[in-house]
């Protein structure tokens, strides 16, 4: 009888423990919280830099690095300019446009279109609730790259100093 009660208690504790882990590891509360973000969170001028790899059809990794400046309009639209290169082939001062969808939990998706080539790329984005900075990772096949952006303040003619 005592052994049956012990087994029942142990099983109950295991079920409770697994339930707790499922609730807290399966869906972290902080990742699902409404942090107040929206497309309006990204507004202003941002500087960025990132590096990574492009992987061609034969599986050959080609190193790449880029930096540039982007202007977000606070309505999910933006424009930017970058310089960078992949595997030693450099592109300078290339313009592009893009759209962002920022969710209340400060995650989102971005789509960019290169002005010259029409190439379309995609990112997942993770935004600070203040909109001061964000990180991103490319989600297109064959691109392994991530980076960050930080909002900067400009006055007409020269950078503003904090």
Annotated model-derived regions:
Residues 1-2, 131:
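Short alpha-helix boundary/capping motifs
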Residues 2-16, 22-23:
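Bacterial N-terminal signal peptides that target proteins for export
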Residues 26-162:
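Mature soluble binding/inhibitory domains
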